[in-house]
């Protein structure tokens, strides 16, 4: 057996909340053969399979009576380079931000707004990760996934992935598809997205009138470091709640009641509300209850001050959801996967 395997192993090093639960089995998959071996082992032992990447979009609320498969495959390359259009590929276990920086170092634009997002390449399509006006689907070409039902490989183009807001086919069917590698369509001709106010403002403050993709990446990294705590210092999973969408009627009703409402109009007429603003209106920013709390600089971020359980984090999240529901009539949906 070439598969690296640990029994009754703590998952604290493998989730950014730093929750100390144990896995019945933990396997580290470095290639497709390891993945297939892990699937066979899980079937042999009658264990469910939980696939993780960087553990940055995960809240563990109990011990995991399963085989936890950590995707650790490495590799990134340029597949084709045709003038303006460059196809790049990365293995699922590649850390996301180093992959972004690798592409920028090669003069490739398209991922700069997604800089410093935690996690792995394989997890990016599951969530359709997004930030500062750009989502993964905007540069997505295709991916290779293994069908856990019959062991076959399948290629998915953008349409087949059914991307939505922090959503995809792979999030809807987590027990079927296991992403092995991802291909993105990047460009050497920069088409920068500078709609997000603080990014444009920071560039102007630095006197950068004609920014490059690397300038945008650097500024976004700086903004994220100011707003979001380092999980190595303070356990967290980044933004804990999705920005909720409301229809035009509800949006107008909310604007009447709250003239300072923060929201972003959508092409379909709906309004995407700033979840952080909704939470902050309830006075939650900087709140602390023992080992769990809300970050002082960003109300969207729930934090583990040390020794918190996943159940304590979930209980705090539920209190915030109830407060926002009562105050605004709006439902907040957690962004991390809860186990």
Swiss-Prot record:
HAMAP family associated with the record: MurB
Lineage, highest ranks first: Bacteria, Pseudomonadati, Pseudomonadota, Gammaproteobacteria, Pseudomonadales
E.C. number: 1.3.1.98
Family membership noted in the UniProt record: Belongs to the MurB family.
Keywords: Cell cycle, Cell division, Cell shape, Cell wall biogenesis/degradation, Cytoplasm, FAD, Flavoprotein, NADP, Oxidoreductase, Peptidoglycan synthesis
GO terms, biological process: cell division; cell wall organization; peptidoglycan biosynthetic process; regulation of cell shape
GO CC annotation: cytosol
Catalyses which reaction(s): UDP-N-acetyl-alpha-D-muramate + NADP(+) = UDP-N-acetyl-3-O-(1-carboxyvinyl)-alpha-D-glucosamine + NADPH + H(+)
Keyword Ubl conjugation: no
Localization per Swiss-Prot or TrEMBL: Cytoplasm
Name listed for the protein in its UniProt record: UDP-N-acetylenolpyruvoylglucosamine reductase
UniProt pathway: Cell wall biogenesis; peptidoglycan biosynthesis
InterPro entries: FAD-bd_PCMH (IPR016166), FAD-bd_PCMH-like_sf (IPR036318), FAD-bd_PCMH_sub1 (IPR016167), FAD-bd_PCMH_sub2 (IPR016169), MurB (IPR003170), MurB_C (IPR011601), MurB_C_sf (IPR036635), Oxid_FAD_bind_N (IPR006094)
SUPFAM superfamilies the record matches: FAD-binding/transporter-associated domain-like (SSF56176), Uridine diphospho-N-Acetylenolpyruvylglucosamine reductase, MurB, C-terminal domain (SSF56194)
Chief localisation class: cytoplasm
Enzyme class: oxidoreductase
FAD-binding PCMH-type domain segment(s): 18-189
Protein role: Cell wall formation.
Record GO terms (molecular function): FAD binding; flavin adenine dinucleotide binding; UDP-N-acetylmuramate dehydrogenase activity
Cofactor(s) for this UniProt protein: FAD
Residue positions of the active site: 166, 239 (proton donor), 335
Species this chain originates from: Pseudomonas aeruginosa (strain ATCC 15692 / DSM 22644 / CIP 104116 / JCM 14847 / LMG 12228 / 1C / PRS 101 / PAO1)
């Amino acid at each position: 057996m070439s598969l690296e395997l640990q029994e009754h192993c703590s998952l604290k090093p493998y989730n950014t909340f730093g929750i100390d639960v144990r896995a019945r089995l933990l396997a580290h998959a470095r290639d497709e053969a390891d993945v297939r071996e892990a699937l066979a082992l899980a079937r042999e032992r009658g264990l469910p399979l939980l696939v993780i990447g960087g553990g940055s979009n995960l809240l563990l609320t109990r011990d995991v009576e399963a085989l936890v498969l950590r995707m650790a495959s490495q590799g990134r390359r340029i597949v084709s380079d045709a003038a303006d259009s460059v196809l790049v590929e990365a293995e699922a276990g590649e850390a996301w931000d180093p992959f972004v920086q690798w592409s920028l170092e090669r003069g490739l634009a398209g991922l700069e707004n997604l800089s410093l997002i935690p996690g792995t390449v394989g997890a990016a399509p599951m969530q359709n990760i997004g930030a500062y006006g750009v989502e993964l689907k905007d540069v997505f070409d295709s991916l290779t996934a293994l069908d856990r039902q019959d062991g076959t490989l399948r290629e998915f183009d953008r349409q087949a992935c059914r991307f939505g807001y922090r959503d995809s086919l792979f999030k809807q069917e987590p027990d079927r598809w296991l992403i092995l590698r991802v291909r993105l369509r990047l460009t050497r001709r920069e088409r920068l997205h500078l709609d997000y106010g603080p990014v444009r403002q920071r560039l102007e403050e630095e006197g950068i009138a004609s920014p490059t993709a690397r300038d945008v990446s650097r500024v976004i990294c700086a903004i994220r470091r100011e707003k979001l705590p380092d999980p190595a210092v303070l356990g967290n999973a980044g933004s804990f709640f999705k920005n909720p969408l409301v229809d035009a009627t509800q949006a107008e009703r909310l604007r009447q009641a709250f003239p300072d409402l923060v929201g972003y109009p959508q092409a379909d007429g709906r309004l995407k509300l700033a979840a952080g603003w909704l939470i902050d209106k309830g006075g939650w920013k900087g709140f602390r209850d023992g080992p769990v709390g809300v970050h002082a600089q960003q109300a969207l971020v729930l934090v583990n001050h040390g020794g918190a359980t996943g159940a304590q984090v979930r209980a705090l999240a539920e209190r915030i959801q109830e407060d926002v529901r009562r105050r605004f009539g709006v439902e907040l949906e957690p962004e991390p996967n809860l186990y």
